[in-house]
Amino acid sequence: TEQAAPAADDPEGMVKASCASCHGQNLEGGVGPALADVGSRNAMPAGMVDPAK
């Protein structure tokens, strides 16, 4: 069976479903770069995330 995508009002669920596999469970980095405190360093590259989400 398919698992439902996390709701927009569940940011932790969205991170676990969409980001953690590459960026680590605590966003410490892994296959992808560390995202912890990323807001204070850079902006998300254009096209990486659908702005509607």
Curated annotation (Swiss-Prot):
Annotated SUPFAM superfamilies: Cytochrome c
Keywords carried by this UniProt record: Cell membrane, Electron transport, Heme, Iron, Membrane, Metal-binding, Transmembrane, Transport
InterPro entries to which the protein is assigned, alphabetical: Cyt_c-like_dom (IPR009056), Cyt_c-like_dom_sf (IPR036909)
Top-rank taxon, per record: Bacteria
Membrane topology (UniProt): Single-pass membrane protein
Binding site for heme c: C19, C22, H23, M44
Places the protein is found: Cell membrane
Gene3D superfamilies, per database record: Cytochrome c-like domain
Keyword Membrane attributed: yes
The keyword Nucleotide-binding is assigned to this record: no
Pfam families (UniProt xref): Cytochrome_CBB3
A single cellular component GO annotation: plasma membrane
Modification after translation: Binds 1 heme c group covalently per subunit.
GO MF annotation terms: electron transfer activity; heme binding; metal ion binding
Protein name in the entry: Cytochrome c-552
Organism: Schinkia azotoformans (Bacillus azotoformans)
